[in-house]
Amino acid sequence: SLDKWGLISLLPKNLIRVGIYEEYFKKPKAGILTLNNVKLEVGKMIYAKKDGKWICTSIVSIQLNDKDVDQVDNGEVGIVTDIELEKGYEIFVKIE
């Protein structure tokens, strides 16, 4: 099919890629991302994709430099979600 060859993208136009979970910890459902000018905040919905499977979940908490923060847009951060994911998930957010 055309999407397998990279000729078309089925990614909705209102989603932007944040990054890939570089590490994942089952407890407390936390993933590590490196952000580059993409705003994440507690309560925001994120969309995760791996092997063609999409999951929608919300951010429960965010850590930057081992401190809890309400929002962040740069750096290596840890985010806790309400649904368990795993290493390798691509993370997306909706453009408002």
Tell me the role of every PLM-derived stretch.
Residues 11-96:
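Beta-strand/loop-dominated core regions that host nucleotide or nucleotide-derived cofactor-binding catalytic loops
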Residues 1-8:
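Catalytic cores of secreted or luminal carbohydrate-active enzymes
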